[in-house]
């Protein structure tokens, strides 16, 4: 039986109503800044500055994004300007699919810590259930990700990873992991939006105490032009992006919208003190057609 860490105090800069609690006893903000495709150092700095100014306290990156060092440098520069320190920021990174396996996964995680200039991460995810260079149907994918998870468990137990989780896993992948792990995943990060509502996955994760975090909440930007979304936004006096993000948050799903525009970063933070009606939630859910704008992991053995 794993020893769960004690429930930790909420940092003073995190409003309780904007926070969820993971199965590790750690708090996690419901809103974070995604950084996919933010690589230029100045773009990273401007986006992070706008995020911190508008109350974001979670930053999501990954080894494959190629921006861990830029994010680490920007945070060291910016945090003191807002009276914040490392403990005020929930920092997530992810294992590259090329680094699956026990030894490679541990080395990759330590490399991410070095790049970010941190001695711990709040959350570290297996980015993809398959191994780069292996066909999706290769049964070796299963063994490699199990080996990676063992490495993450050790790093979690050593304190370098406060929580561990997975990204792009299906119910099948999660069932397999839960049958063999010592430390259960705290978070599942997946593509989730009205056209890909992930109802079965959400129900499964709720039953197992795994928090679901959405990426591509705007459908890579295309859903902001969807007539049904625009109608709800006009009715609410909100932007389509705010409606899409609120739709997830209102289900208890955290969101990590990405933008290089400080104005949009600010707009995306305005998710509180208003609600979509039950009818509006259902109108948006009716758009569900199983559409992936990003990657579909269902074919990975």
Predicted regions mapped to residue ranges:
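N-terminal binding-site loop/beta-alpha segment at the start of enzyme catalytic domains
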Residues: 1-89, 219, 299-300
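Generic structural signal for well-ordered alpha-helices
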Residues: 17, 48, 68, 72-76, ...
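Acidic (Asp/Glu)-rich catalytic clusters
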Residues: 22-23, 72-86, 113-118, 178-181, ...
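Active-site mouth loops of central-metabolism enzymes
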Residues: 31-42, 94-102, 135-138
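Short, acidic/polar
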Residues: 39-52, 101-116, 172-174, 196-197
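A short, structured active-site edge motif that brings together acidic residues
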Residues: 85-99, 123-129, 191-192
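CE4/NodB-like, metal-dependent polysaccharide N-deacetylase domain
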Residues: 105-126, 154-158
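Beta/alpha (TIM)-barrel catalytic core signal, keyed to glycine-rich beta->alpha loops juxtaposed to Asp/Glu
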Residues: 128-301
């Amino acid at each position: 039986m794993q020893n769960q860490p004690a429930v930790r105090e909420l940092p003073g800069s995190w409003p309780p109503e904007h926070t969820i609690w993971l199965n590790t006893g750690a708090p996690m903000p419901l809103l974070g800044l995604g950084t996919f495709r933010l690589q230029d150092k100045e773009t990273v700095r401007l986006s992070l500055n706008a995020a911190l100014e508008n109350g974001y306290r979670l930053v999501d990156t990954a080894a494959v994004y190629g921006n861990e060092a830029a994010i680490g440098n920007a945070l060291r520069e910016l945090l003191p300007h807002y009276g914040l320190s490392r403990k005020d920021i929930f920092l997530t990174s992810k294992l590259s699919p090329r680094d699956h396996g026990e030894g490679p996964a541990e080395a990759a995680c330590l490399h991410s810590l070095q790049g970010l200039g941190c001695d711990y991460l709040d959350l570290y995810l297996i980015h993809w259930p398959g191994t780069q260079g292996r066909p999706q149907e290769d049964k070796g994918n299963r063994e490699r990700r199990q080996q990676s998870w063992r490495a993450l468990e050790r790093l979690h137990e050593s304190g370098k990873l406060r929580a561990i989780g997975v990204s792009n896993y299906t119910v099948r992948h999660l069932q397999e992991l839960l049958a063999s792990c010592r430390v259960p995943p705290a978070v599942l990060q997946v593509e989730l939006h009205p056209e890909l509502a992930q109802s079965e996955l959400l129900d499964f994760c709720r039953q197992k105490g795994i928090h679901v975090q959405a990426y591509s909440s705007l459908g890579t930007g295309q859903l902001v032009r969807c007539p049904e979304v625009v109608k709800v936004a006009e009715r609410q006096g909100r932007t389509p992006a705010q409606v899409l993000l609120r739709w997830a948050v209102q289900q208890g799903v955290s969101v990590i919208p990405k933008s290089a525009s400080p104005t949009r970063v600010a707009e995306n933070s305005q998710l509180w003190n208003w609600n979509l009606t039950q009818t509006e939630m259902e109108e948006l859910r009716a758009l569900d057609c199983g559409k992936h704008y990003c990657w579909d992991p269902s074919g990975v053995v």
